A protein has these predicted regions:
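Solvent-exposed, polar/charged alpha-helical surfaces in well-ordered, non-transmembrane soluble domains
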Residues: 102, 106-110, 288, 292, ...
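Short hydrophobic beta-strand that contains or immediately precedes a catalytic carboxylate
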Residues: 91-95
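Catalytic His-Asp segment of secreted/periplasmic serine-dependent ester chemistry enzymes
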Residues: 348-437
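Active-site segments of SGNH/GDSL-like serine hydrolases
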Residues: 303-309, 330-365, 380
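Coil residues (strongly favoring Ser/Thr
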Residues: 38, 65-67
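Bacterial Sec-dependent N-terminal signal peptides
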Residues: 1-38
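Short N-terminal segments immediately surrounding and downstream of signal-peptide cleavage
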Residues: 26-54, 341
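Conserved SGNH/GDSL esterase-like catalytic core that processes O-acyl groups on lipids
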Residues: 100-212, 218, 222-323, 406
Length: 437
């Protein structure tokens, strides 16, 4: 059936390419776009359809077709493994407020983990955003006791030892606690918790020590890692994680929590999402433990979704934006030069709800340059939306929010669908080329 579809597609493309057809250039371009949309809808099977979406642009762009080879090799090994092997593929998706809410990344995580080819290796990186007095993802609850203060990389007045999340919570009370409880969300039950990593600067002698509050007989092992985390493996799956503190020396005065990773011992996809409201590329360069925690996460794919806040001011330094991304790419490759890197362009926005933002197109152009110059992949969501002023159309059909910056929950779900389909399509092409039957 797929072979027949491909033949039909090529036939239609050939017909549209015949110069003798009496179409003017504009008509031909429009008909080609409509054909591309139809082809993609046919190949993607069932998906939500919206007239405002440029489905023909929904593809992974690469100068070098090998840009995602490392990730696809790992994905294929996971897909074809024996059950007892329990391999995991790790994805780190970093960004700003679009990522902190986890609507977009949550949908992608769900699609990967519910795909029978891959499986569920856990919720991944989490943070007690509620303790930091900011919005928490909806698939887990945060509870805490004691007084906690937040330190954010986006605040110039804040100074802290940040990791990949770019946000910390701190306390001076050794009796303070934090609990993370995954919950059912959108009819999806939470992943089981068989292993947890608590990230904090363990080499800082002035910090209290982190401990897991759980029955001793449910803890199989505990180990402190020099990469800056306490790893606890459970003998019984947990439904929530409670973190306590232990003051073991008079020199200890406070505690800094950088994040918590919730994992299983099964094979599957571990999709970490880290983002903070207002984040720009330059802010991630303030994170002292960024590379250290990258080494501990060992991502096979790093997705970078930044640019909305860089491009928001009227005076946008697109050269600095590109330079900061180069530094982030270099940090990733310092840890593993083979790690696949996928950039995503920011969505179209307005400033103050009424001024169309020309800078987003500049950001998209710099990302195109990076794709060509740094052998990274690009998912051009700006083009998929429809480009300049497209957020207006997205808002009209319920896909964008009134602020003309963020998408609605429906919009983020659609974005997740599109992103996953683009990756999956490129993965299938890779299999056809490198693992032919």
């Amino acid at each position: 059936m797929m072979k027949i579809k491909k033949r039909v597609i090529w036939f239609l493309i050939i017909i549209l390419s015949i110069p003798t057809l009496a179409f003017c250039q504009d008509d031909l371009q429009e008909k080609t776009k409509n054909l591309e949309d139809s082809i993609r809808l046919m190949l993607y099977k069932e998906r939500p359809y919206f007239e405002v979406v440029n489905y023909g642009a929904n593809r992974i762009q690469m100068k070098d077709s090998s840009s995602l080879d490392y990730f696809f090799e790992k994905l294929y090994a996971l897909q074809t493994q024996k059950k007892e092997e329990k391999k995991q593929v790790k994805i780190l998706h970093m960004g700003d407020s679009h990522i902190q809410a986890d609507f977009f990344t949550g949908k992608v995580r769900r699609l990967f983990q519910e795909d029978k080819r891959f499986g569920d290796a856990g919720r991944g990186f989490t943070f007690p955003y509620s303790a930091a007095k900011t919005n928490n993802p909806f698939d887990y609850k945060t509870r805490y006791t004691g007084s906690w203060t937040s330190q954010k990389m986006v605040s110039n007045k804040d100074q802290s030892q940040w990791g990949i999340s770019g946000i910390n919570v701190e306390t001076t009370n050794p009796k303070s606690t934090i609990t993370l409880e995954p919950i059912e969300y959108n009819e999806r039950k939470p992943s089981k918790i068989e292993k947890v990593r608590i990230y904090y600067p363990i080499l800082n002698e002035e910090l209290f020590e982190a401990v897991i509050i759980a029955p001793t007989n449910e803890i199989k092992s505990q180990k402190m890692h020099l990469d800056g985390y306490l790893e606890v493996i459970f003998s019984v799956p947990q439904t929530s994680i409670s973190i306590g503190l232990d003051k073991t020396d008079d020199i200890q005065t406070h505690f800094i929590l950088q994040g918590v990773s919730l994992e299983t011992n099964d094979g599957g996809i571990l999709y970490h999402a880290v983002g903070i409201n207002g984040a720009e590329t330059r802010h991630y360069l303030r994170c002292e433990d960024f590379e250290t925690q990258l080494r501990s996460v060992q991502p096979d794919l790093v997705v970078i979704s930044l640019g909305t806040n860089d491009a928001y001011p009227s005076r946008f330094d697109d050269t600095a934006f590109k330079g900061n991304l180069i530094k982030i790419i270099e940090q990733v490759r310092n840890i593993n030069p083979n790690t696949s890197i996928l950039l995503t362009s920011p969505n179209d926005t307005y400033r103050y709800k009424k001024y169309a933002n020309y800078n987003t197109q500049k950001a998209e152009e710099r990302l195109q340059e990076l794709m060509r110059e740094k052998s990274v992949a690009l998912w051009n969501f700006y083009q998929i939306m429809g480009g300049f002023k497209s957020i207006i159309d997205w808002h009209k059909v319920g896909l964008g929010q009134y602020d003309k910056i963020h998408l609605s929950q429906t919009g983020y779900n659609l974005q997740g669908d599109l992103f996953y389909e683009a990756i999956n399509e490129q993965y299938q092409k890779w299999i056809d080329k490198n693992r032919p039957k």
